[in-house]
Amino acid sequence: GTRLNGAKGKIDAKVHSPSGAVEECHVSELEPDKYAVRFIPHENGIHTIDVKFNGSHVVGSPFKVRVGEPGQAGNPALVSAYGAGLEGGTTGIQSEFFINTTRAGPGTLSVTIEGPSKVKMDCQETPEGYKVMYTPMAPGNYLIGVKYGGPNHIVGSPFKAKVTGQRLVGPGSTNETSSILVESVTRSSTETCYSAIPKASSDASKVTSKGAGLSKAFVGQKSSFLVDCSKAGSNMLLIGVHGPTTPCEEVSMKHVGSQQYNVTYVVKERGEYVLAVKWGEEHIPGSPFHVTVP
């Protein structure tokens, strides 16, 4: 409460959260000369409240109010990030990485990706924190900044990801920035025990695939496609390429995170090829694929 000793005028208040956001607040008169400032905090940590009367701070303003237990504020030093998407990727293909906030208490997460193209960015909650997905459209170096609970970077941030592949957008400015902000809630690591439930055994019908390499290829050039086994339980991915006479020179499979595989292959001659993609013993939907090399 604030006392004004009978002076007439306007009281107004502003609440600043630890991350610098201005929170909405309501000033109400409890009785003549006594006011209450109410706000709903979205972050733990020290909030600063400016209370002004006719534009000047009242005695004691700005007030400091702690929300949550000490040490419970979103502490960026306790947040970690990992995953292939922090190191690199390919244009037009979604890269992803994970952010673990279980040790940090609630805070606002901000992810900024700066590089040669805008990226389509998406974020999903996971039991441990967040999964961030982004699709770069031009090759080059991207700086990925991850901040938590305010203006401070988490450990290792900014990360530098090297993206290869063709440029899929017209030349833009040299530096494009994309960012997302997520208001986090408390996550305790006890939630992670759910991920220990054994996954249903294998189901090849749940594997999906996409990419030009499933239908066409060119002599001496890399063809690629993406296979997503994330919903198919546990098994191994087997790839075979069968050509007219010469064996396929090179077939490589790279796990790009959470059971998604990027497969590339190079063919040596023209003709009809058969491409088999199996999850354990069973063909995935669409397999065997027929690939024509002109």
Curated annotation (Swiss-Prot):
Recorded superkingdom: Eukaryota
Protein's job: Connects cell membrane constituents to the actin cytoskeleton. May promote orthogonal branching of actin filaments and links actin filaments to membrane glycoproteins. Anchors various transmembrane proteins to the actin cytoskeleton.
InterPro entries: Filamin, Filamin/ABP280_repeat-like, Filamin/ABP280_rpt, Ig-like_fold, Ig_E-set
Biological classification of the source: Eukaryota, Metazoa, Chordata, Craniata, Vertebrata
Keywords: Acetylation, Actin-binding, Cytoplasm, Cytoskeleton, Isopeptide bond, Phosphoprotein, Repeat, Ubl conjugation
Region (Hinge 2) location: 164-198
MF (Gene Ontology): actin filament binding
Organism per entry: Oryctolagus cuniculus
Filamin repeats (start-end): 1-67, 71-163, 199-293
Subcellular location: Cytoplasm, Cell cortex; Cytoplasm, Cytoskeleton; Cytoplasm, Myofibril, Sarcomere, Z line
SMART domains (alphabetical): IG_FLMN
Modified residues (N6-succinyllysine): K210, K216
Family: Belongs to the filamin family.
Any one Gene Ontology BP term: actin cytoskeleton organization
Modified residues (Phosphoserine): S61, S157, S173, S184
Region feature Self-association site, tail, mapped onto this chain: 164-294
Name of the protein described by the UniProt record: Filamin-B
Residue numbers bearing the N6-acetyllysine modification: K268
Record PTM: ISGylation prevents ability to interact with the upstream activators of the JNK cascade and inhibits IFNA-induced JNK signaling.
Gene Ontology, cellular component aspect: cell cortex; cytoskeleton; Z disc
Record text on subunit structure and interactions: Homodimer. Interacts with FLNA, FLNC, INPPL1, ITGB1A, ITGB1D, ITGB3, ITGB6, MYOT, MYOZ1, PSEN1 and PSEN2. Interacts with MICALL2. Interacts with RFLNA and RFLNB. Interacts with HTLV-I viral p13 protein. Interacts with ASB2; the interaction targets FLNB for proteasomal degradation.
Annotated crosslink Glycyl lysine isopeptide (Lys-Gly) (interchain with G-Cter in ISG15) location: K160
